[in-house]
Amino acid sequence: MSQSNLQRSMPIVTLPDLFDARFDNRFVRQLPGDPETRNVPRQVRNAGYTQVSPTPVRSPRLLAWADEVGEMLGIARPASPVSPAVEVLAGNRILPSMQPYAARYGGHQFGHWAGQLGDGRAITLGELISPNDKRYELQLKGAGKTPYSRTADGRAVLRSSVREFLCSEAMHSLGVPTTRALSLVATGEAVIRDMFYDGHPGAEPGAIVCRVSPSFLRFGNFEILAAQKEPELLRQLADFVIGEHFPELASSHRPPEVYAKWFEEVCRRTGILVAHWMRVGFVHGVMNTDNMSILGLTIDYGPYGWLEGFDLHWTPNTTDAQGRRYCYGNQPKIAQWNLTRLAGALTPLIEDDAALEHGLAVFGETFNNTWSGMLAAKLGLASLEHSDDDSLLSDLFETLQQVETDMTLFFRCLMNIPLNPISGNRATTFPAPENLESVDQMNDHGLVELFRPAFYDAHQAFSHAHLTRLAGWLRRYIARVRQEGEPEGLRYHRMSRANPKYVLRNYLAQQAIEALERGDDSVIIRLMEMLKHPYDEQPEHEDLAARRPEWARNKPGCSALSCSS
């Protein structure tokens, strides 16, 4: 893999080397750690973390670097793919100011209490102080065994690491609250995995992602303390989180009120987060409580996926294929269920049930209002307050599921329909608006033809029943837009910021994985460039906006994923 390939995505900015970064580790300093030092699987008590160092790897090599994250942290891109800085990002070297640890937490998995979980292969190096004095945890995922590894090997494979690296940055560019990713490093070692848990394990290349977040604390960090009846540590952890990450609450409220206000804010942020997921068609895939961020960020990119054919019941996770607990349409309900588990864990701090119920109500209100506003924007409307808007939406969702229709492409096509063609040149996947007939002049077939790029089965899409139904809905939509009486350019602008043209389709990530396995980094570099501007027309990347190709329909890694990573 060439040095030039690693650097061609954008110009190098002069920044300090990683070795000059400042670390100040308040979490380790302010919370009690595990007094035991044995790095063997075991139950940990009365501690928020265990100090543990990464296990060195044979031959680390930098595969990808996120320039924007490096600039945010004030860290220069490593001078070469095998530089000393890469040794740090692989866990082979620890800087003097780092204090690596694995966090202790528990969680509910698929609706059942799973007991102690913890960072079984993720090791936080420390808290970096950025040039603007913000704190960020740097965490290596796949860094080796910890006391929380149970029977696992503490490593991660290339395929899951590429997916996490890419999706972290894709979500940020989409405007979705998320953790970030700084680097992707190959370990030079093989990892044995049974990808679909079907009795066919095989060797895969290993990798390590350096994840970045103000905090990786989860609902499960609090759940384990409540479950193990450690109320004083529960209070310490809550005080730490509020003081560090919700300082406006700490300065204006005192216990016990501050805990209720904090829970309310966690509920509010989670409502906004899930509404964003729904807006862009993202399905997390494994919404266990240990995968829910206390800061309202998307965390732990495992068997996630993006809606291609619109389906409220779709899940990318093979483990969830039967129950579909974590499917697209269930995500708001599951988020509230998870928040209820967090509320239960916080009862030693918030004895007033009404305060907890209020927080949960805030989640529902926040999600509903945010999602309603986002749906209005996706349709180019100022709001969804007309009497027939509910039926307009429900009929749309039913119609989209009648024939396999790509969610992302459908809304981009809807954005481009020529309601009132405007002058000037507007980039579009269709002919310029002035060359299109007005929708008033189109018959049903001509109107539906504008959506051909979104259909996976054109024969079904243009059947009489579906054509009539979709065209009927489109004419209702057009009438509704005209009721607004707003300039066409305003509708287009709203929709262009709410409806991405580019998302990280599973097959695109899989192509990047397979290319890296061959030693080719050009695919991931191109994806990183495209994903920086998901709402923009990018003619040089037009092929990456197309619907999933037929060869990827049933290909492992493209259509179905497991928790194996």
Curated annotation (Swiss-Prot):
MF annotations from Gene Ontology: AMPylase activity; ATP binding; magnesium ion binding
Keyword annotations: ATP-binding, Magnesium, Manganese, Metal-binding, Nucleotide-binding, Nucleotidyltransferase, Transferase
Keyword Cell membrane: no
Top-level taxon in the UniProt lineage: Bacteria
Residues annotated as catalytic: D290 (proton acceptor)
Pfam families with a match to the protein in the record: SelO
Residues binding Mg(2+), per UniProt: N291, D300
Catalytic activity line of the entry: L-seryl-[protein] + ATP = 3-O-(5'-adenylyl)-L-seryl-[protein] + diphosphate; L-threonyl-[protein] + ATP = 3-O-(5'-adenylyl)-L-threonyl-[protein] + diphosphate; L-tyrosyl-[protein] + ATP = O-(5'-adenylyl)-L-tyrosyl-[protein] + diphosphate; L-histidyl-[protein] + UTP = N(tele)-(5'-uridylyl)-L-histidyl-[protein] + diphosphate
Amino-acid positions noted as binding ATP in the UniProt annotation, renumbered to this chain: G118, G120, R121, K141, D153, G154, R211, R218, D300
Cofactor: Mg(2+); Mn(2+)
Listed EC numbers: 2.7.7.-, 2.7.7.108
UniProt family annotation: Belongs to the SELO family.
Protein purpose: Nucleotidyltransferase involved in the post-translational modification of proteins. It can catalyze the addition of adenosine monophosphate (AMP) or uridine monophosphate (UMP) to a protein, resulting in modifications known as AMPylation and UMPylation.
Protein name, UniProt field: Protein nucleotidyltransferase YdiU
Lineage: Bacteria, Pseudomonadati, Pseudomonadota, Betaproteobacteria, Nitrosomonadales
